[in-house]
């Protein structure tokens, strides 16, 4: 069977006219699958999940139609669907309350911040059925929105790294 498929692919791509008419290789779904260079499936995806404080919350994100922020208690449903579809990993992004932001991004070091609670919830409910990715960054936690500490509008790289490594 594999030899037959290889022969078909070879003739369809390397043959001379009239055998080499590439639209023939795209005419039917089965032939497109045979000659495709790559394929994309749920197992190739990472699901971004945007988190918000509170209980039983699902909030739309105006700038991204059909995308939502979820409270940690809603993760069971969201992550459960991802696991059933075969998505191997989620990426968590917090929407930090303005009251918890400061110029140093201190909330990033809180072991009970939104992302840490999300990680604990997913690990407890799903064990190793799905991977968890997080952005090691300060921008969700700083009052100025930059990904590093600022001094006179300049990022302080070394000082920022000190915080990020904690």
Go through each PLM region and give its residues.
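Active-site cofactor/substrate anionic-group-binding motifs, chiefly glycine-
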Residues: 60-85
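Short, well-ordered coil/turn segments that N-cap beta-strands
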Residues: 42-45, 86-88, 126-130
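Glycine-rich, proline-tolerant flexible connector loops at the mouths of alpha/beta enzymes
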Residues: 59-67, 89-114, 141
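N-terminal amphipathic alpha-helix/helix-capping segment at the start of soluble metabolic enzymes
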Residues: 12-57
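Alpha-helix-loop-beta-strand connector modules within alpha/beta enzyme cores
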Residues: 103-134
């Amino acid at each position: 069977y594999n030899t037959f498929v290889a022969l078909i692919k070879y003739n369809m791509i390397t043959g001379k006219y009239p055998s080499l008419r590439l639209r023939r290789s795209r005419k039917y779904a089965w032939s497109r699958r045979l000659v495709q260079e790559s394929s994309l499936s749920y197992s190739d995806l990472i699901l971004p999940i945007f988190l918000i404080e509170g209980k039983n919350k699902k909030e739309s994100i105006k700038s991204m139609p059909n995308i939502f922020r979820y409270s940690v208690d809603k993760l069971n449903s969201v992550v459960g669907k991802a696991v059933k579809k075969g998505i191997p990993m989620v990426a968590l992004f917090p929407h930090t309350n303005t009251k918890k932001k400061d110029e140093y991004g201190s909330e990033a070091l809180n072991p009970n911040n939104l992302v840490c609670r999300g990680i604990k919830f997913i690990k407890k409910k799903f064990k190793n059925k799905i991977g968890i990715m997080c952005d090691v960054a300060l921008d969700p936690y700083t009052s100025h929105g930059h990904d590093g500490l600022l001094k006179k509008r300049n990022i302080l790289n070394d000082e920022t790294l000190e915080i990020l490594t904690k």
